[in-house]
Amino acid sequence: MINPDYLIDYSDWFDEGGYCQVYPIKDKKDLVFKEFRNKKKAQESYRYHKKLAKFDLAPKIYSKICKLEFAKEDDLYQPEPSDWGYVTELARTHTANTKISMADIQHLVDEIYKKTGLKFWDCHWYNVGMVKRGKNKKVVCIDTGKESFDGNSNAWANPDPGPKCSYCEKYECDCCD
């Protein structure tokens, strides 16, 4: 089903991860479309995303699973409609060790587990972002694919999810080497 309420702004930026691409939405600077390679991947991500967003641990969701048309641009190739995905609030990502600290990531990991029972294993800097909540910024999970929660994508190689060592409680240590 093509959602007529939004258009992908193909002339602007886009970003990609291992399982999805993220496109800006035309005339909606704070919304993006997360596109997946198939409907099953989109549905899996949507389920996790919805569970996290319920507790404000992921960007807000603005659509159900759908496809979108690309906005028409003069003198540019007009792609076919997108693959399956959904519209969410834009979360800004940052370079590692800049605006989002290891403590921020660990707090998010702990909140996700406390509120949903999920273990956010793939919690590296490029799988988290910041959203605005009033005048404040909040760190949220932006990779909601099932691989982020299955334990096979352990971003920090600790026995528990997150950058804090489970043994010495430090963020950078040698006790596991």
What residue spans do the PLM features occupy?
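Catalytic activation segment of kinase domains across protein kinase-like and atypical kinase folds
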Residues: W121-D174
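Active-site beta-strand termini and strand-to-loop segments that position acidic
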Residues: P24-K28, L90, V131
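Protein kinase-like catalytic core scaffold
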Residues: L31, L57, Y86, K138-V140
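Protein kinase catalytic-loop region centered on the HRD/HxD motif
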Residues: D110-L118
